[in-house]
UniProtKB/Swiss-Prot annotation:
GO terms classed as biological process: peptide biosynthetic process
SMART domains reported in the protein's UniProt record: EFP, Elong-fact-P_C
The protein's name in its UniProt record: Elongation factor P
NCBIfam families: efp, PRK00529.1
A single Gene Ontology CC term: cytoplasm
Pfam families registered for this protein in UniProt: EFP (PF01132), EFP_N (PF08207), Elong-fact-P_C (PF09285)
Subcellular location, principal: cytoplasm
UniProt pathway: Protein biosynthesis; polypeptide chain elongation
InterPro entries, per the entry: Elong-fact-P_C, NA-bd_OB-fold, Rib_uL2_dom2, Transl_elong_fac_P/YeiP, Transl_elong_KOW-like, Transl_elong_P/YeiP_cen, Transl_elong_P/YeiP_CS, Transl_elongation_fac_P
């Protein structure tokens, strides 16, 4: 399916130069001279190599036709992850490398989205928002307004992110996994 270059978004899978690529990042650029373009960071789904590609905003790119299916994470043994289709209860194993650095958000029961291309799993992603518990946080000095209003916190998965000063140890927070940032307190 052809799509305008200006419509490329992170998370999409493109069929470009005979290979499948995952769009990791995009940036729209309007130079003073010449036409606008999209600077995209692409990841080759076969080799894992990343590279930069420039697409004209008014040009067209071929988007791969993929089927996205939700799978529940059951367990992992290091290199392989075992997942279960939430509709058919069919189990599938995928490489842990498919999630890359987002694998830190895996915990039993989390729902992942798998992308299938011609019957093969080509990509996997965690939800955009996950709920995690704060296990360690810095103390805040009352009245400290001259510096940043965020403090560092360690989550149950070992990740360190910045949180507002009112967050305490033991609280559950929502983390935006796209850029690994605090979103809000969990509404349990």
């Amino acid at each position: 399916m052809a799509e305008r270059g200006s419509d490329i978004r992170p998370g999409q899978i493109l069929d470009h130069n005979g290979s499948l690529y995952l769009v990791v990042k995009t940036m729209h650029t309007q130079p003073g001279k010449g036409g606008a373009y999209i600077q995209a960071e692409l990841k080759n789904l076969k080799t894992g190599a990343k590279y930069q590609e420039r697409f004209r905003s008014d040009g067209y790119v071929k988007r791969a036709i993929v089927e996205e299916v939700e799978y529940q994470y059951i367990f992992g043994d290091g290199a392989l992850l075992t997942l279960m289709n939430t509709a058919t209860y069919e189990q599938v194993s995928i490489s842990a490398d498919m999630l890359g650095e987002k694998g830190v958000y895996l915990k039993e029961g989390i729902i992942l989205t798998l992308s299938f291309y011609q019957g093969q799993v080509v990509a996997a992603r965690v939800p955009d928002y996950v709920v995690l518990e704060v296990v360690e946080t810095e103390s805040v000095i009352k009245g400290q307004t001259a510096s940043s209003s965020y403090k560092s916190a360690v989550l149950e998965n070992g990740e360190r992110i910045s949180v507002p000063p009112f967050i305490k140890v033991g609280e559950r927070i929502v983390v935006y996994t796209v850029d690994d940032t605090y979103y809000e307190r969990a509404k349990d």
